[in-house]
Amino acid sequence: MRRKATDVMLELIASAQAVGLSAKYVLFDSWFSSPKTLISLKEKCHMDTIALIKKNKTKYLYEGQNLNIKQIYSKNRKRRGRSKYLLSVNVTLKKDDEALPARIVCVRNKSNRKDWLALISTDTNLSEEELIRVYGKRWDIEVFFKSCKSYLKLVKECRSISYDALNAHVAIVFTRYMLLSVAKRRNEDDKTICDLLY
């Protein structure tokens, strides 16, 4: 029987918590950022979320109206100049009879300056700058795994079905990545030139 990815995700987080792993936030891309998922995560795992949201027809309760993100964006004045974000609004997520307050922050898309991206957080006390900074960590993790898969043979080099062999392979690939990161930093970071600025 196939299970929904969102149900499996909730199970994985609950099992991680059961063995003592903790985190401040769960970071998602837009795939998992539906109001239903965010509310379920808060209810079942008692964790706040920071996620990218899709510009689709998903409705958020904003100033007494059910609006999608494009409608919320067009209804509000944007911050001008070199601000880190364009818009920040508080909304309410709805699922059946349940409601959860959240904050949506819209930022410029770095790859297309005329476009914008929307981030959501269920921690309404989190500042806009901190929300953007924390979500940026998720992108660093994506780049890390893409590099490991594409260049360091994380997926293709080891064909074993032994747990120990797979674990050793992952450790070797991650060590390769760390060595390359240190070499890159030493070659590119001005602070490391001739050991002058340590």
Q: Each PLM stretch: what is its role?
A:
Residues 1-198:
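Single, function-defining residue in the core of a domain
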